[in-house]
């Protein structure tokens, strides 16, 4: 090849190199993709990574992360469902079966349950209230000789049988703190003692407790418990007094009157009294030795009863059965949401009829000649 031919060949080679280089620097894919441009469509950055890395590695990472996300979501759904289950209100027919006791009244005309042994499902109730982590309060008054005669046995038996397995606060009202006996309590129980002003007459002691309970609910009890019972001290727990008794407002059937006709009840029959209930009216006769409900409902009960007591004092009259007469008037106008059978406050002097399957709480022997002289 002559010199001219070599020059031409060299120029062609240089031109080709220049063209290739120019295409390379102006191509986003680079020289490798330019060479195979006709076989590879333009792809974005993520697709390039997928092409360069093995599929099994990329998919493995993705599935693992997705699995973790799915597990977290499932846990979240389970937690939300658990919270929803915990706050779902328990329906009456979930735990109550009135047909189990056909021989007695188990449902009122306003559809409130009357709780008798055998009518309730304890397991369902315990499971529900355990999730709620409830605290139940119990107020009791021991004035004068009631401290030495009744207080220790009442609290000791309550420690054993009242709301077992749940937090309980005993609110003990006395006129002499120095006389309160030491009582060893079980787990989940606490004891709070308050000194109250003594009254000259036992009738006034009985009636003034409505005022005192209301004051303590407002001051602290409403922030400390979910439910509250108020009981007389001259009683003894005989068996489990449990969560089947809890409700918005709870009334106790009086053992001596639960089978009587309303016209025979010892309601206050004088028109001058705020506790007046005329003949022909009334549902049941309720015992003031046991009543309860939520703190706000109990506050309303005590405040309304005390208003009636003050009105009677203003009119120089005293209801036949004092605070109990006013309590019966209250429940006539404000129907209780739950009623406890006489099994929950029984007097053994009546005997033990077939209606009474299990005595939960019983009256102590009344020694009025000893304990009512508080002057």
Curated annotation (Swiss-Prot):
Domain of life: Eukaryota
Enzyme class: transferase
Residue spans, topological domain Cytoplasmic: 1-6
Lumenal side: 28-375
Localisation per UniProt entry: Golgi apparatus, Golgi stack membrane
Topology in membrane: Single-pass type II membrane protein
Domain remarks in the Swiss-Prot or TrEMBL record: The conserved DXD motif is involved in cofactor binding. The manganese ion interacts with the beta-phosphate group of UDP and may also have a role in catalysis.
Family assignment from sequence similarity: Belongs to the glycosyltransferase 6 family.
Name the UniProt record assigns to this protein: N-acetyllactosaminide alpha-1,3-galactosyltransferase
UniProt lineage: Eukaryota, Metazoa, Chordata, Craniata, Vertebrata
């Amino acid at each position: 090849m002559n010199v001219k031919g070599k020059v031409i060949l060299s120029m062609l080679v240089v031109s080709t190199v220049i063209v290739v280089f120019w295409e390379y620097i102006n191509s986003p894919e680079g020289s490798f993709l330019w060479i195979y441009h006709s076989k590879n469509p333009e792809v974005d950055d993520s697709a390039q990574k997928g092409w360069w890395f093995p599929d099994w590695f990329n998919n493995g990472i993705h599935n693992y992360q997705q699995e973790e996300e799915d597990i977290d979501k499932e846990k979240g759904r389970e937690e939300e469902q658990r919270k929803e289950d915990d706050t779902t209100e328990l329906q009456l027919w979930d735990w109550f079966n009135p047909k189990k006791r056909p021989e007695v009244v188990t449902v009122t005309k306003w559809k409130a349950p009357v709780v008798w042994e055998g009518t309730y499902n304890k397991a369902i109730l315990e499971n529900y209230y355990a999730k709620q982590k409830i605290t139940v309060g119990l107020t009791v008054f021991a004035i004068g000789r009631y401290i030495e005669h009744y207080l220790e046995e009442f609290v000791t038996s309550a420690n054993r049988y009242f709301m077992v397995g749940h937090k309980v606060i005993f609110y003990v009202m006395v006129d002499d703190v120095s006389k309160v006996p030491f009582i060893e309590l079980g787990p989940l129980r606490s004891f709070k003692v308050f000194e109250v002003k003594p009254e000259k007459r036992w009738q006034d002691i009985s009636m003034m407790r409505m005022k005192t309970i209301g004051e303590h609910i407002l001051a602290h009890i409403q922030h400390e418990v979910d439910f509250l019972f108020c009981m007389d001290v001259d009683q003894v727990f005989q068996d489990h007094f449990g969560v089947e008794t809890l409700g918005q407002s709870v009334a106790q059937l009086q053992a001596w009157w639960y089978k009587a006709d309303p016209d025979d009840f010892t309601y206050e029959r004088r028109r001058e009294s705020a506790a007046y209930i005329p003949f022909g009216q009334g549902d049941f006769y309720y015992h003031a030795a046991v009543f309860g409900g939520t703190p706000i409902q109990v506050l309303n009960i005590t405040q309304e009863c005390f208003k009636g007591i003050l009105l009677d004092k203003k009119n120089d009259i005293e209801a036949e059965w004092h605070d109990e007469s006013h309590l019966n008037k209250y429940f006539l106008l404000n129907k209780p949401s739950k009623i406890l059978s006489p099994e929950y406050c029984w007097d053994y002097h009546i005997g033990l009829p077939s209606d009474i399957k299990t005595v939960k709480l019983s009256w102590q022997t009344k020694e009025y000649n000893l304990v009512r002289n508080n002057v």
